[in-house]
Amino acid sequence: MDLILLQKVTNLGNLGDKVSVKPGYGRNFLVPQGKAVPATAANVEAFETKRAEYEAKANTILADAQSRATKFEGASVTIGAHASTEGKLYGSVGPRDIAEAFTAAGLPLEKSEVILGEGAFRNVGEYDVVLHLHADVETTVKVIVESDA
C-alpha cells in the first residue's frame, strides 16, 4: 500500500515522503491517525498544493514538543505503591501510573509517550524514564518508586 506521509513517522519517513507499507499498518494506524493519506493522483496533487500548510503545522508541533521537553528537564515524580519489606512491589508501576503522576504534578503526559525499555517497575527504587514526546524529541525524567505502607 502506497501512502504519502503528512508528518514525520519514526522509522518510516518524513513529511511528504511516498512510502510503501503493509496494508494493515496503513489502513488501521497511519490513515486513521492522520499521519498519512493514500498515494492516489488526486491526493498527490492536493498534498503539493497544501505542502506549505503541512510543513507549518509540523513545525508548530515540533516547537510544542520541544517546549514540553524543556518543562520536563530535571523533573521527577514520586509514586507510592504497596511493597513487601524486601522492596518488591505487590503490583507494578507502568506507563499509565507514570503518566498519571506527572499529570497530577501539573505536567500533562500521555501514557503512549512513556517508554519503559525493560517493562514495568516491580521494585522500590529510582528509575530513569525516557519520554518520547515527538519523533525528534525525547527527554529523560526520574521516577522514584517508594513503599507507601
UniProtKB/Swiss-Prot annotation:
GO molecular function: rRNA binding; structural constituent of ribosome
Superkingdom field: Bacteria
GO cellular component, one term: ribonucleoprotein complex
Biological processes per GO annotation: translation
Keywords, ordered alphabetically: Ribonucleoprotein, Ribosomal protein, RNA-binding, rRNA-binding
Alphabetical list of Pfam families matching this protein: Ribosomal_L9_C (PF03948), Ribosomal_L9_N (PF01281)
InterPro entries with a match to the protein in the record: Ribosomal_bL9, Ribosomal_bL9/RNase_H1_N, Ribosomal_bL9_bac/chp, Ribosomal_bL9_C, Ribosomal_bL9_C_sf, Ribosomal_bL9_N, Ribosomal_bL9_N_sf
SUPFAM superfamilies: L9 N-domain-like, Ribosomal protein L9 C-domain
Membrane-crossing residue ranges in chain numbering: none
Family: Belongs to the bacterial ribosomal protein bL9 family.
HAMAP family found in the cross-reference section: Ribosomal_bL9 (MF_00503)
Purpose of the protein: Binds to the 23S rRNA.
Protein name: Large ribosomal subunit protein bL9
Lineage per the UniProt record: Bacteria, Pseudomonadati, Pseudomonadota, Gammaproteobacteria, Lysobacterales
Gene that specifies this protein: rplI
